[in-house]
A protein has these predicted regions:
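C-terminal binding/interaction regions
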Residues: 1-55, 60-77, 82-128
Length: 128
């Protein structure tokens, strides 16, 4: 099991030590899509959902999700996020909500999981 980075010699889970890695600028982009029916699409587009402005709430939820990534994903390092840009848009042709997150930091490990968590949380919020 020594070939796997998240397991020690005894096969037990461990968090990888990134202390010796240099601090560099890290950026990750993730995207997702939530498909909806015509009625739901029109309600989202026209602000008619009972829960309010779906896109704004989902955008905030995505940012919050990115910030909570190490609480959700085992062995994910807590990092100091420098920025999160989350964009949600409506695609009339696909009847979908398009979601894209860009996350950046200066650190020793990447921000891919934070970008993916931002998109996932935003998508779940749209669906809710």
């Amino acid at each position: 099991m020594a070939d796997f980075t998240h397991f020690n010699e005894q096969g037990r889970a461990k968090m990888v030590d990134v202390g010796e890695k240099p601090v560099t600028v890290r950026t990750a982009v993730a995207a997702g899509r939530v498909l909806v029916n015509r009625t739901t699409f029109d309600l989202i587009k026209n602000g008619g959902m009972k829960k309010g402005d779906v896109l704004t709430v989902a955008q905030i939820a995505g940012v919050m999700g990115a910030k909570r990534t190490p609480d959700l994903i085992p062995m994910c390092h807590p990092i100091l996020i420098d920025g999160i840009d989350l964009e949600l848009s409506l695609d009339e042709e696909r009847l979908s909500v398009e979601i894209q997150a860009s996350v950046s930091c200066g650190g020793r490990t990447g921000v891919e999981m934070e970008a993916l968590t931002a998109v996932s949380t935003a998508a779940l919020t749209v669906y809710d």
